Amino acid sequence: DIRGKNGALRDDLATWMVRGGFFVLHGAVWSDADLQNLTAALRKISRTELQWTPIPPDHEIMRSFYLLDALPECAGRAWRGLQFDGRLAALAPSIDLLALLKDKPSTTPCESVLTREQATRIFVNIMMVSLATDYKKDQIHLPEILKRLR
C-alpha cells in the first residue's frame, strides 16, 4: 500500500512515472492528504513541481475512444490527474471503477450511478490514454518511417 510507510514502493512508482509510465490509484477514494503524501514522494524523484488537478471535460480521457460527457463524481469529488512531462502520468478516480467491471459487480452508492456499459467505456478510454501516453513525442519518428516506406 503506497499510502503506508513503504517509501521504497513510492520511489518505484515515481521512477516508473519518470520513465514514461502511467498509473491509476485504484480502490478506496484517496484523500487530499494521501495524494499530498504521494506527491511529495514523487517530487523527490522527478525533481519537478507536481499537482493533482481535476480532469476537465475536454481532457483526452473524454475522447480517446468513446466520446464521454463527464466522469462520475462521488460525494462531490472529481476525478483527479497528475500531469508530468506534458502528459497524464497518474489518475485518481473518485469511484472504484474495477468493482463495476467484475463478473459480479460490487457497488457502493457512488458506483451505482454508472451502468456497466458506461464503466466499460470509461475503462477503455483510460486504457487508450495509458497505452499512448506520449504518442505526440513519438511522432518525431514519423518522417523516418515515411522515408523507409518510400
Language-model segments: what does each one mean?
Residues M17, M62, M127-M128:
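Detector for methionine-enriched segments
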Residues A14, V18, F22, R43, ...:
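Sec-exported extracytoplasmic/periplasmic mature domains
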Residues A14, A90, E144-R150:
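Long alpha-helical segments found as membrane-embedded helices
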